[in-house]
Amino acid sequence: GETHRFRPLIDLYKAAGVKAGHPEGSLQVGLHSLGYVAATSRQAADEFFPGYAEAFTKVGKERGWPPVTRAGFDAQLGDKGALMVGSPDEVAEKILRHSEALGGVSRVTFQMDNAALPQNKLLKSIELIGEKVLPQIH
């Protein structure tokens, strides 16, 4: 979903923490998302989608959800979508945008692995995150 919708919960968490005696600066917020980085946005989406669709269609059957579609997946790749899948520049911009919407985050974690991604592609994604994404967000 849209990250900014979680802001009231984060504000509540921080207010409760301060009320409980914790210094405001000590109350950290993390962002956990499905994520994958490739050289281009199209490559990232095309490589990540098959495993994503397989996993979430299976979960959806158990929960009564409709099957995953490429159109629905692509919609989650947009500016406000929850998926952090794209080129290094796109993912860096999305991390910064989500952090701002949430009032700042201290940690970002990606769940990258899925059944359709071979190890070499995962390792390349990790390399791109370290070399191309992190310098833009620090």
What is the predicted role of each segment?
Residues 1-138:
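Active-site-adjacent structural elements that line small-molecule/cofactor binding pockets in enzymes
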